[in-house]
Regions:
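Pre-active-site segment of Zn-dependent metallo-hydrolases
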Residues: 5-52, 60-67, 79, 130-136, ...
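Histidine-anchored nucleotide/phosphate-binding helix
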Residues: 58-66, 201-202, 209-210
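Short active-site oxyanion
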Residues: 69-74, 152-153
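Glycine/Thr-rich phosphate-binding loops of Rossmann-like dinucleotide-binding domains
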Residues: 20, 57, 84, 130, ...
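Short, solvent-exposed loop/turn segments at secondary-structure junctions
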Residues: 1, 16-18, 54, 127, ...
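Cap/insert and terminal regions of metallo-dependent hydrolase folds
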Residues: 38-40, 46, 73-75, 79-82, ...
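Metallo-beta-lactamase
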Residues: 1-40, 76-157, 176-183, 235-256, ...
Length: 260
């Protein structure tokens, strides 16, 4: 997502690669083109990364952003800064030129907007991390709350349903908009501890007290899970009809704009 708040341009888990995989010839392949061509991006001020899975952290994309956008800063879960140090040219982990900031759960950082300050909070959800067979849980994972006096936004990252989302709602006091993952949920016996389904996404919106929500994490890479690429929006609409919750939860086309 490209998030624009008070003159700031931020990206969430940017990925312009053709595969969500360590291999160029195998693994989940891109089905849907990015909503914005890379060369059409505005000047990017900051990037937030939710975790290090291959569909969320792409080396070529990160390097291209680091090279093309001077002054960019990456906010990452604790541990991922070491990946930046070894893999991404131009990474600075400390000092006045620092451009990679690692946060623990519950920590926050700030950016100066055009008129007011934007606070970035890194918040725990249930998921996991790994880039290879031997590094599971070595880095953190989580969600991001971008809190501005005029607009409050929550990016879920990947998550399973857990009490964490209720905690986020209580801690942060609610949001104007939440971007909530709705895809990669089948088969449930395998995915339920890692990914919510569309029905659970409705409950997550209620838990975090978001006035509006958009569904993300669907329809982009083929081979991530068992449901068809276009199934998540259909299941979300069905869940909305069956739910007793009154929700404002929509799915945008890739490249479509949501505006407050």
């Amino acid at each position: 997502l490209l998030v624009q708040i008070d003159g700031l341009n931020l990206l969430t888990d940017p990925h312009w690669g053709q595969r969500a995989s360590p291999f160029s010839f195998a693994g989940p392949k891109r089905h849907q083109a990015p909503g914005i061509p890379f060369d059409k991006l505005p000047a990017i001020d900051a990037v937030v990364i939710s975790h290090n899975h291959w569909d969320h952290l792409d080396k070529d994309t990160v390097q291209a952003l680091m090279t093309a956008h001077k002054g960019i800063r990456f906010y990452v879960p604790l541990g991922i800064q070491h990946w930046f140090k070894t893999e991404i040219k131009g990474s600075v982990l400390q000092g006045p030129a620092q451009n990679v900031v690692a946060l623990d759960w519950g920590q926050q950082a700030s950016l100066k907007g055009k008129t007011k300050k934007l606070d970035l909070h890194f918040l725990a959800v249930q998921h996991w991390s790994a880039r290879s067979i031997g590094d599971r849980y070595e880095t953190l994972w989580g969600s991001w709350a971008l809190m501005h006096p005029d607009f409050k936004f929550w990016f879920s990252g990947d998550l399973a349903y857990s009490p964490d989302t209720q905690d986020i709602g209580k801690r942060m006091g609610g949001f104007d908009l939440a971007a909530i993952a709705i895809g990669a949920y089948e088969p449930r016996w395998f995915m339920k501890d890692s990914h919510i389904n569309p029905s659970e996404a409705l409950q997550v919106q209620k838990d975090v007290n978001a006035k509006a929500a958009i569904g993300i994490h669907w329809g982009t890479f083929d081979g991530m899970s068992d449901e068809p690429l276009d199934q998540a929006p259909k299941d979300l609409e069905l869940a909305k009809k069956e739910s007793s919750l009154e929700v404002n939860f929509v799915v945008l086309k890739h490249g479509q704009i949501w505006q407050k």
